[in-house]
Amino acid sequence: MNDKQHGPFIVEGKLADSERMKQESNFLRGTISEDLTNGLTGGFEGDNFLLIRFHGMYQQDDRDIRAERAEQKLEPRHAIMLRCRLPGGVITPQQWLGIDKFAEENTLYGSIRLTNRQTFQFHGILKGKVKLAHQLLNQVGLDSLATANDVNRNVLCTSNPIQSELHQQAYEWAKKISEHLLPRTRAYAELWLDKEKVATTDEEPILGSTYLPRKFKTTVVIPPQNDVDLHANDLNFIAIAEGSKLVGFNVLVGGGLAMTHGDKNTYPSMASEFGYIPLEHTLAIAEAVVTTQRDWGNRTERKNAKTKYTLERVGVETFKAEVERRAGVKFEAIRPYEFTGRGDQIGWLKGIDDKWHLTLFIENGRLLDYPGKPLKSGVAEIAKIHKGDFRLTANQNLIIAGIPESEKQRIETIACRHGLIDDKTTVQRKNSMACVSFPTCPLAMAEAERFLPEFVTHVEQLMNKHGIGDEHIVLRVTGCPNGCARAMLAEVGLVGKALDRYNLHLGGNRIGTRIPRMYKENISSQAILSIMDELIGRWATGRQPNEGFGDFLIRTDIIKPVLDSARDFYDWQEAV
């Protein structure tokens, strides 16, 4: 690749400083090795603060004690969050036991956080333990390369345990796509695994020496489940099957949910349909989409660097034609597909191979030993005896997959004893999700994970008050507008602005194919509950059979749908 790009679809101008950082990083090495030996600070400094993200890490600090430490003239309590690369979310029990032990012995919080990108995160790794974390992952056959920053991130794959044969085929493609789009630099192996430096020049034939303009997310989706929320992602492969055989993919490009408060040039966006491809063209199309975005994406303004903005600027047809040219493939007409849901089916399900699958609801994805509810220990106990695999879902839950009939009762007993199965968990709680936010996320503006459980309790009370306690609303809370909890695809989305202040978005749908519109700006959680009380009451009495909350709000004109987010997302006052 020629990194000096020019042409009608290249954004000219002064490059963002992140581009300088990548160019000068020596293929993601920077001075990270020197920083590791600097005992004067618990953090990484200068460019390394951002470069470690390419290696799957974010530098954070405990914001609950930040002010107190500042008063004591101490630097923030720096610690690292590490995110594993786990395409499709599949992990073996043996691998799980390794990460469980590391979390217990080497992190400040002792927890494992399942994420809605089908992987897990360690929070609270001190700098002196970072190398140990990478070496542990390597020992069990895992890594954290390219799970953050301007690369193709962890590739998602629908976790439908019933369609075992089809899932396996789709999962294999998720792994192939992940491997094909990985950085080729040896920096990760040299820095963390003590591999010898090789006297050759690094090359990045797909990503280029300055990598992508912005993060890039990819999914493999098996209808009728949209558990991966395809419209939150840059590149999506929708599985098309004939019987139980995968024959090709519909390709959708340019989804993304992040925005910036107060900047109307940023907005969430749905992915656009490009067409259908047979299986043999999958990697060529994936590479062509990535390289087109690599060359045409905006490198002067990071807020507008995502694929969704490139498509809006150059046009979907222009981008699609360039992908076809680079791949040497013509898209066929989109094949029919339909989504009917996106939540996990909690509990026992039998697969076509006569094996059983147990989906455990993990509130907020946080596995920790709580008083009277030792969740983390329970999963470890199951891992010690389970012969199948674990599957992390895009809803932050955990599937114990491939359980023979003879082991079913034994595993259920362990799960119940440790609080991993709770018959009192409502369908509303199972369909609610939050990002991590405080105290560890540096971008958090409002509470999310710590806020959600009690907030859901209040919503449950409202549902019961109006006689629909067995119903649910897809509810998401995110602590800032970057969109990690995918609130911009929820029926009710709360986006944090300040402590106990949220923008309230309404009007998404249950299957994740409509962006919710802002209904009220910068209001308290109590005000949100008052609004929901009234609207849930109207839904309870005025809904049509099987009509979801978001669909009801749109049909009754309580709020107008977002039809073209680049143009109408911010017309909220006229649309309410």
From Swiss-Prot:
UniProt catalytic activity: hydrogen sulfide + 3 NADP(+) + 3 H2O = sulfite + 3 NADPH + 4 H(+)
Gene3D superfamilies, alphabetized: Sulfite Reductase Hemoprotein, domain 1
Binding site for [4Fe-4S] cluster: 435, 441, 480, 484
Keywords: 4Fe-4S, Amino-acid biosynthesis, Cysteine biosynthesis, Heme, Iron, Iron-sulfur, Metal-binding, NADP, Oxidoreductase
GO MF annotations, alphabetized: 4 iron, 4 sulfur cluster binding; heme binding; metal ion binding; NADP binding; sulfite reductase (ferredoxin) activity; sulfite reductase (NADPH) activity
Entry-linked InterPro entries: CysI, NiRdtase/SiRdtase_haem-b_fer, Nit/Sulf_reduc_fer-like_dom_sf, NO2/SO3_Rdtase_4Fe4S_dom, NO2/SO3_Rdtase_4Fe4S_prot, NO2/SO3_Rdtase_4Fe4S_sf, NO2/SO3_Rdtase_FeS/sirohaem_BS
Enzyme Commission identifier(s): 1.8.1.2
PROSITE patterns: NIR_SIR
Record keyword 4Fe-4S present: yes
Name of one Pfam family that matches: NIR_SIR_ferr
Binding site for siroheme: 484
Any single GO CC term annotated in Swiss-Prot or TrEMBL for this entry: sulfite reductase complex (NADPH)
Pathway assigned to this chain's UniProt record: Sulfur metabolism; hydrogen sulfide biosynthesis; hydrogen sulfide from sulfite (NADPH route): step 1/1
GO terms classed as biological process: cysteine biosynthetic process; hydrogen sulfide biosynthetic process; sulfate assimilation
Cofactor note: Binds 1 siroheme per subunit.
Known cofactor(s): siroheme; [4Fe-4S] cluster
Subunit composition and interactions: Alpha(8)-beta(8). The alpha component is a flavoprotein, the beta component is a hemoprotein.
Family: Belongs to the nitrite and sulfite reductase 4Fe-4S domain family.
NCBIfam families the UniProt entry points to: CysI, PRK13504.1
Function of the molecule: Component of the sulfite reductase complex that catalyzes the 6-electron reduction of sulfite to sulfide. This is one of several activities required for the biosynthesis of L-cysteine from sulfate.
Cited PANTHER family: SULFITE REDUCTASE [NADPH] SUBUNIT BETA, SULFITE REDUCTASE [NADPH] SUBUNIT BETA-RELATED
UniProt-recorded name of the protein: Sulfite reductase [NADPH] hemoprotein beta-component
Origin species: Photorhabdus laumondii subsp. laumondii (strain DSM 15139 / CIP 105565 / TT01) (Photorhabdus luminescens subsp. laumondii)
Lineage: Bacteria, Pseudomonadati, Pseudomonadota, Gammaproteobacteria, Enterobacterales
